[in-house]
Amino acid sequence: IVYDEDRIAVISQDKKLFLYNHGETTDGVKEIGQGVEGIHFSNDGKKIAFWSRNEIAVYFARKWETQPSREEGQKIDIVRFSQPIKNVSWFKDYEHLIFSAGDKIKIVELDNRSIKNINDLVDLNLDDFKATYNNREDNLFFINKNNENKKLYSISLTEENEE
């Protein structure tokens, strides 16, 4: 997966994640994960979310100066579940991740300074579904993959303003 000419990520056949990173303090190829199922760059390319069957981590390809600050090359373990993790997406602020574990869609913050905040967004009561988050519209879309009459569902995550 190519973010730009200075940041390129590759998942090998044996599920190792390699990152070519030409940054301020790093230059070259480095293995940053094992058992990796997928990855997403943040919109600015400074962060890379990657996940295995049961864990999500974030690697900082560039220095992050917003609190809490992180250094280039820093890796943070975000969550670990006994259930398989799927449907990982960045939330619109790129300081939270949306993912599914079991039949629940959850949101977790990246801030690891204290107790990790993880919340359930929705309990779908479905065995097998595909979900994705659209940050432009602030909608969560999902489809039941086991249903013959597949339907696309949408949930708005935008807070309504009280007037």
Task: State what each model feature region is.
Residues 1-32, 59:
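Solenoidal tandem-repeat scaffolds enriched in leucines and small polar residues
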